[in-house]
Amino acid sequence: EPISPCKVAGGSVVESQSESLAETPLAALHRELGGRMVGFAGYALPVQYPAGIMAEHLHCRNAASLFDVSHMGQAELRGEGAAAALEALTPADVAGLKPGRQRYGLLTSPSGGILDDFMFANLGDRIFLVVNASRKEHDFGHIAAHLPQGVTLHRHEDRALLALQGPGAVPALAALAPGLAAFSFMGIGSFDIGGVNAIISRS
């Protein structure tokens, strides 16, 4: 069964055409597929496709649907001491996270207040981060401001970020990369998808 392209999930949308909106790497494809583009967290994203929201909802519940979440913030922490540097900013256990695993965490202020939630993963030689769209400038600025010498933050503004959701998600991806069939919850790794190297996680 085909995978349905679906609207971005959560938050609020603004249909004003006067605002200056950023676009994800998949914006042209959304328009080609008939997506109705609206403003969401400063980006032009599809709120629905011609089949309608109900059809999209049911398809996601019964099969699998692909969501463009490229508006979220992606970055990597590199350098010796990267895990310790991030652990100083979150109560989550970063140093104890094994390669190929990811974890949910809270980004905190120096006084211990919660600034945002985020995901982080151990990719072996670097730590991969995903933060919320509406807070990414603040979050990445906060992280960068507290990094010690030798640890650097590298943002990935040009990368797409997709969420494949639904009971058919694993079979759909496993057909393209067989190793994904045995992928465990909160795992992450690099896979070849149609000749493209992709970082894929299950969360």
Language-model-detected regions and their locations in the chain:
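Basic, glycine/lysine-rich polyanion-binding surfaces/domains
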Residues: 3-203
